[in-house]
Amino acid sequence: MNTYFIAGTDTDAGKTVAACAFVQYLVKQSQQVAVMKPVASGCHWQNGQLVNEDALNLMRQSNTSFDYDRVNPYTFEAAIAPHIAAADSGVVIDKERLLKAVDWFHERPIDSLVIEGAGGWQLPLASGLRMPQVVKEVNAKVVLVVGLKLGCLNHALLSLQSIKQEGCDVAGWIAVQTGPEPMPRQAENLASLRELLDEKELASIPYLPGWTEEDLSIYFHK
């Protein structure tokens, strides 16, 4: 089974739309694809259960079906940094629990597991625990989502440098236009990303207000 981790250059970089696009792309390759959002804040109550909209969107794009708790083990209502939300809730985000949650999918009949992170790459989860430590242990290939906004060149370069320093493999990167208006000189910035980044550009996704109903796989490069 292939395991992919969708990381962002920062918060609101477009991770969810990119992750859903990647899931659609893999499904079109005739793969059985499972999804995870291991840690999520900004959750809401639905039928007596805390759920996260990003996780629900991922589940809608997947062609496999698993219980919500398998997809999103840690849920927090407050829309704040997960380690702070966890502390407020009297919860400690546990590395072993996260590793076991991922390992559970390894025992299922699936071809790929797509894991969406939270926040940026170096997300703190608990005292002495950051998301990259989990990503490395589950041997996931990282897909970096670059939100096309001012500062994205620096953020992309720093994120990729950090991913490699953590000993993780990079599957490629996806550019996402994050708002209705393109960033200043967007075409030139995208060209600069292509020049500066050695890793493969997987897709470039425009701003799509109704993206949950779109075929996002068309934005992947052949």
Swiss-Prot record:
Task: Report one GO cellular component.
Answer: cytosol
Where, by residue number, does ATP bind?
Answer: 12-17, 54, 116-119, 176-177, 206-208, 213
Quick one: which pathway?
A: Cofactor biosynthesis; biotin biosynthesis; biotin from 7,8-diaminononanoate: step 1/2
Q: What class of enzyme is it?
A: ligase
Q: Which reactions is this enzyme annotated as catalysing?
A: (7R,8S)-7,8-diammoniononanoate + CO2 + ATP = (4R,5S)-dethiobiotin + ADP + phosphate + 3 H(+)
Listed EC numbers: 6.3.3.3
Q: Which CDD domains match?
A: DTBS
Source organism, top-level taxon: Bacteria
What keywords is this UniProt entry annotated with?
ATP-binding, Biotin biosynthesis, Cytoplasm, Ligase, Magnesium, Metal-binding, Nucleotide-binding
Q: InterPro entries, per this entry?
A: DTB_synth_BioD (IPR004472), P-loop_NTPase (IPR027417)
| Residues at the catalytic site | K37
Q: Indicate which residues the UniProt annotation says bind Mg(2+).
A: T16, D54, E116
One GO molecular-function annotation for this sequence? magnesium ion binding
Binding, substrate: S41
By its UniProt entry, which NCBIfam families does this protein fall under? bioD
Annotated protein name in UniProt: ATP-dependent dethiobiotin synthetase BioD
The upper taxonomy is: Bacteria, Pseudomonadati, Pseudomonadota, Gammaproteobacteria, Alteromonadales
